[in-house]
Amino acid sequence: MFKLDLQPSEKLFIPFITAGDPVPEVSIELAKSLQKAGATALELGVAYSDPLADGPVIQRASKRALDQGMNIVKAIELGGEMKKNGVNIPIILFTYYNPVLQLNKEYFFALLRENHIDGLLVPDLPLEESNSLQEECKSHEVTYISLVAPTSESRLKTIIEQAEGFVYCVSSLGVTGVRNEFNSSVYPFIRTVKNLSTVPVAVGFGISNREQVIKMNEISDGVVVGSALVRKIEELKDRLISAETRNQALQEFEDYAMAFSGLYSLK
């Protein structure tokens, strides 16, 4: 299990990529680039054919990964390869619940352990159904990451009291995707979550530029960035796949990712 111990001036930068997009070996290099860009932890997404929480950018990434033959087992093993190749930040497996259900639970947790996966995030599992999985995570020393969206304060308290690692605070209802602006009601909601939580609070769903990062960092402990990075991978995919242009494309990706991290001001 991991804890994110932040210094007062330090902010979380938690990027999301889809395992196997555009091809598995490039996913490893992308993870290393994100670590160099200042990532605090990495969300590694499992490609799924019916991703209810994801917008078109991540849906297309899932399709590219599925076309490569990716599945939950291969995604976990890819996380292990990342750890073997120098990624030492926590890796959080981001998966819908159905792929987990397809596996024997002991086998699933053994895979997580063997591949040094640090955390688990299941976006489509409501609070009422998550307790047994949370307990299993605890017994296997895997950090279960809780998602919170605007809801009643009593429900918020229940979710946040059980939170480990960090709280993933959903900035917008609906699917993931780049947003130019957020509803004004999101800011008091984030402040409420921050006041209730004893673990760091990271804001995700729609963070797409440096200005939004600065704004969210003022009221939370940092950001989760998914669609903006996955869209950049899509833009660079042909150059990332080609051995001749890969290094240059990886550097371009790292520079782009750094705008979301605490290293931006050091560059």
Swiss-Prot record:
Quote the PROSITE patterns the UniProt record gives: TRP_SYNTHASE_ALPHA
InterPro entries named in the record: Aldolase_TIM, RibuloseP-bd_barrel, Trp_synthase_alpha_AS, Trp_synthase_suA
Keywords, comma-separated and alphabetical? Amino-acid biosynthesis, Aromatic amino acid biosynthesis, Lyase, Tryptophan biosynthesis
Query: Which GO biological process entries does UniProt record here?
Result: L-tryptophan biosynthetic process
SUPFAM superfamilies assigned: Ribulose-phoshate binding barrel (SSF51366)
Alphabetically, the GO molecular function entries are:
tryptophan synthase activity
Q: Which Pfam families does the protein's record reference? A: Trp_syntA
Q: Looking at its record, which EC class is this enzyme? A: lyase
What does it catalyze? Answer: (1S,2R)-1-C-(indol-3-yl)glycerol 3-phosphate + L-serine = D-glyceraldehyde 3-phosphate + L-tryptophan + H2O
- One GO cellular component, as annotated: cytosol
Q: Where does this protein act, in terms of pathway?
A: Amino-acid biosynthesis; L-tryptophan biosynthesis; L-tryptophan from chorismate: step 5/5
CDD domains under this entry? Tryptophan_synthase_alpha
Q: Has the keyword Phosphoprotein been applied to this entry? A: no
Secreted as UniProt keyword: no
Active-site residues, Swiss-Prot/TrEMBL:
E43, D54
What EC number(s) would the UniProt record show?
4.2.1.20
- What functional role does this protein have? The alpha subunit is responsible for the aldol cleavage of indoleglycerol phosphate to indole and glyceraldehyde 3-phosphate.
Similarity comment: family membership:
Belongs to the TrpA family.
Q: Describe its assembly.
A: Tetramer of two alpha and two beta chains.
Descriptive protein name: Tryptophan synthase alpha chain
Q: Which organism is it from?
A: Bacillus subtilis (strain 168)
The organism's lineage?
Bacteria, Bacillati, Bacillota, Bacilli, Bacillales
